[in-house]
Design a protein with these regions (language model features):
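Extracytoplasmic
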Residues: 34-36, 55, 71-73, 99-102, ...
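N-terminal signal peptide c-region/cleavage motif recognized by signal peptidases
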Residues: 18-20
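Primarily a LysM-type cell-wall glycan-binding module
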Residues: 25-55
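Bacterial N-terminal signal peptides that target proteins for export
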Residues: 1-8
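Solvent-exposed coil/turn segments that connect beta secondary-structure elements
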Residues: 65, 80-83, 110-111, 119-122, ...
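Extracellular LysM carbohydrate-binding repeats and other cell-envelope/extracellular binding modules
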Residues: 24-32, 57-93
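Exported/periplasmic cell-wall-interacting domains
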Residues: 141-147, 159-252
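A structural motif detector for short, solvent-exposed N-terminal "entry" segments of globular domains
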Residues: 88-137
Length: 252
């Protein structure tokens, strides 16, 4: 991954065209690369039995964008140089962008990932994400996470819950929620990420990633930032989405 500076506009261009690359699952596309091997999970195999080392296990989970409990038949892409790899080696985002003079979070539903850039434009952390699904059966319509530029306006704790889902009374856990667009928020997913966009419009994250964003990176409105919370840019799912208006669904 080149380390030269890239502007935010370049990120938008790069990620808009990601769906052609990510037309299949993230895992299937990695499996086509010579630097990866792919395995089918067998009965009684688990993350721990397949990848006893914490470092290796974390990288494989993040590459495949999932951390749910493994089941027989699931496909996993594994780097051939796993033991010497760093998670930044597999970032779908540039390692450096033009400085924006403020911190920035980018969410790419196409890459099923998020990125955190410091004020100097350096990528300091990225991770898997599960954004709004193409269709939600319980409400009978699409529930994409809305593309655009937003700012975090409300921060929650580990006890944050949805007041809407599951229907009709809500109650779904949304630990470390960070609301950025009406009822849409970044938050942890205690049940794990499945490797595809599956939410009602929120952006689901690993719980430890959400906790880090909530307490170590993202800021809500306060006097020090002129009451402008941390910027969150949500990229389109595909080029057409920039000219369409998916139905809005609040919360998880």
């Amino acid at each position: 991954m080149p380390k030269r500076g890239l502007g935010i506009g370049m990120i938008v261009v790069c990620l808009i065209f990601l769906p052609a690359t990510y037309a299949k699952t993230i895992t299937q596309n990695f499996c086509k690369l010579s630097d990866f091997k792919c395995i089918r999970v067998k009965r009684h195999q688990s993350w721990e039995s397949l990848f006893p080392d914490d470092h290796d296990r974390d990288i494989v989970k993040r590459i495949n964008r999932l951390n749910i409990e493994l089941y027989p038949g699931i496909l996993l892409a594994v780097p051939k140089n796993l033991s010497t790899s760093n998670i930044m080696d597999f970032s779908p985002f540039p390692l450096k962008v033009d400085p924006q003079d403020e911190k920035l979070v980018i969410v790419s539903p196409a890459a099923e990932a998020w990125a955190a850039y410091d004020v100097d434009g350096t990528l300091i952390r990225w991770g898997p994400a599960s954004a709004g699904a193409n269709y939600c059966r319980d409400i009978g319509k699409p529930c994409h996470t809305h593309p655009g530029s937003f700012r975090v306006f409300t921060l929650g704790s580990s006890n944050c819950i949805s007041h809407k889902f599951p229907l009709p009374n809500g109650g779904a856990p949304m630990p470390y929620c960070m609301y950025f667009n009406n009822g849409q928020a970044l938050h942890g997913e205690p049940n794990g990420l499945p490797g595809y966009n599956a939410s009602h419009g929120c952006v689901r994250l690993y719980v430890n990633d959400a906790e880090w964003l909530r307490y170590d990176f993202i800021e809500g409105p306060n006097p020090d930032n002129d009451y402008r919370g941390t910027q969150v840019i949500v990229e389109p799912y595909y080029p057409a989405s920039s000219s369409s208006s998916p139905d809005e669904d609040d919360e998880e």
